């Protein structure tokens, strides 16, 4: 696969690869850990769509909804916890009777705190390059 900008950089860290949008590194990492591990991680992060477990998944070849994609990034800003998303929080009648209330619950941690810190640091690098 081509990298953003069409250049290859040789051996780089994952932080540099993320900052420079190096697709070749994403593909290599997927081959190393295996496509099934990528799919499992995506599902753990909140992606619910069916994903094809192949090496091209690193390039975004499986379709997901915008909500899934957005919610998959939330654990990085939320201490590793998966979001408990509700669009409708409460439904009441005109006189105030509650028909529905989404009290929410405690969301499960889906990423270890040390991984959250590393990823946040690497994602910050994407805007500092």
For each predicted feature, which ranges?
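Active-site-adjacent helix/loop patches that line small-molecule binding or acyl-intermediate pockets
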Residues: 2-78, 122-125
């Amino acid at each position: 696969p081509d990298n953003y900008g069409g250049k290859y950089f040789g051996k780089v860290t994952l932080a540099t690869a993320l900052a420079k949008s190096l697709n070749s590194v994403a593909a290599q990492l997927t081959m190393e850990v295996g496509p099934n591990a990528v799919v499992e991680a995506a599902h753990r992060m909140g992606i619910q769509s069916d994903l094809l477990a192949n090496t091209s998944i690193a390039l975004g070849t499986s379709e997901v909804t915008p909500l899934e994609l957005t919610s998959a990034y939330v654990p990085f800003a939320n201490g590793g916890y998966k979001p408990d998303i509700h669009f409708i929080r409460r439904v009441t009648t005109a006189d105030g009777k509650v028909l529905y209330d989404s009290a929410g619950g405690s969301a499960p941690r889906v990423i270890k705190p040390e991984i959250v810190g590393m990823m946040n640091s690497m994602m910050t690098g994407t805007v500092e390059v």
